[in-house]
Amino acid sequence: SEKIFSRAGPQLQQACRDIGRIQTGAAVITEGFNLPCDAVIHTVPPHYSGGDHWGCQSLNQLKDCYENAIKIAIKHNVDSLAFVSLGTGGNQFPHMMAAQQALEVLMKYQGEFQNLIVCLASPSSLKIWLKAYEQLHIRHAA
């Protein structure tokens, strides 16, 4: 998110300060300012602990991040939506688990957008997401 804030300019940081804190799993929208997009949807992913009933609360909150961001995008007539892999950085979600949660939501809404993109940081992340997609596809086909 530091890269996004530095590229967007100080207006984005001020817009976020004006909004204030949001709850884990919630999402809000701001202008894109100096970014090559009309808007930025912000969400707060949970920290993964695995200790709360095997991480169920965290998993549900992670799904909420995607779901709430998508609902805001639909409400604002966004036709292209890009996500990063939420929760996998400092929030410590295992990449496979995060990918599975994200894909369950993203696949449900894929027809709502002209482009629905996930930006991944590395080839190894792409392999994990592709494996998660294959597993989800097999599970839904059965």
Task: Please report, for each region that a protein language model flagged, where it lies by residue.
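Phosphate/ribose-phosphate-bearing ligand recognition and processing surfaces
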Residues: 48-142
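Glycine-/small-residue-enriched capping loops at alpha/beta junctions
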Residues: 1-75
